[in-house]
Amino acid sequence: MKKRFVCNISTLALSLLVLPLLALSEQSGHGVQTFTGEVMDSICTPSGSHAATMAKMSGMGKDSETCTKACVALGAKYMLYDQTSHTVYSVNQQDKVARFAGHDVRITGTLAGNKIDVRDVDELG
């Protein structure tokens, strides 16, 4: 009886340690994943559109690419905006997405919180 009790306590203790780690791993999205969306900037992503920024500020251009580049020149960061889920992701490797400003892309990488560590970027369409 005592041996079974010790075994059950050990199993319970191990479960209490391992289960939160598994949940954290799932939540953080460890492992390579694929993300799709438009390479936008941190000024325009809250609205999910460049239209408001282009209407408010002159010199932002008349298309997504020009607006994104102009916002980044003002100090904004490149972001990935998933139009389907309305999710905004930060991008750790800004240089890897810069040439895709204002374009729809597929990013392969790992997710930690809402930040993508970019491995590869391909333009869609």
Locate the predicted segments by residue.
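Positively charged n-region of N-terminal signal peptides that target proteins for export
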Residues: 1-4
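Bacterial N-terminal signal peptides
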Residues: 9-23
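Conserved RNA-binding domains used in RNP assembly and mRNA/RNA metabolism
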Residues: 24-125
